[in-house]
UniProtKB/Swiss-Prot annotation:
This is Low molecular weight phosphotyrosine protein phosphatase. Keywords: Acetylation, Cytoplasm, Hydrolase, Phosphoprotein, Protein phosphatase. Phosphorylated by LCK. Phosphorylation at Tyr-132 increases its phosphatase activity. The lineage of its organism: Eukaryota, Metazoa, Chordata, Craniata, Vertebrata. The modification Phosphotyrosine is found at residues 132-133. One of its GO terms (cellular component) is cytoplasm. The active site is at residues 13, 19, 130.
Length: 158
């Protein structure tokens, strides 16, 4: 019975070293703080294979440390199994969404609801821009967007 009440979310971006690990860490903290972490399976992944095996970008790690949010992740690429086992796959931009929809069409047993994480933003900022070529303030912007979106998503999905 407990198995049925477990929900799952996979956060996805291009390389799985900037945006999606931040979203994953933010969401983990939210469900931990609300004592519902045992009800959620949370992970993140990349649409590409560029960064597989790498840790999150050091600027993202610094940002999370400043906010007191633990972050430990190793970049991985999304798999066919992810589409069949996650309830939600939340991505960061239109390019991610196109890639995910294309990949999901190749999976017969896709059960995941694929959406932009930004679609949950109360401030209506639909796209979470890649901060890779930016600076610390760009990572802070991503963090703030992820906090708003993850809170709203949890409210709806809980």
């Amino acid at each position: 019975m407990a198995e049925q009440s477990t929900k799952s979310v996979l956060f996805v971006c291009l390389g799985n070293i900037c945006r999606s690990p931040i979203a994953e860490a933010v969401f983990r903290k939210l469900v931990t703080d609300q004592n519902i972490s045992e009800n959620w399976r949370v992970d993140s992944a990349a649409t590409s294979g560029y960064e597989i095996g790498n840790p999150p970008d050091y600027r993202g790690q610094s940002c999370m440390k400043r906010h007191g949010i633990p972050m430990s992740h190793v970049a991985r690429q999304i798999t066919r199994e992810d589409f069949a086992t996650f309830d939600y796959i939340l991505c960061m931009d239109e390019s991610n969404l196109r890639d995910l929809n294309r990949k999901s069409n190749q999976v017969k047993t896709c059960k995941a609801k694929i959406e932009l994480l930004g679609s949950y933003d109360p401030q209506k900022q639909l796209i979470i821009e890649d901060p890779y070529y930016g600076n610390d303030s760009d990572f802070e912007t991503v963090y703030q967007q992820c906090v708003r979106c993850c809170r709203a998503f949890l409210e709806k999905a809980h």
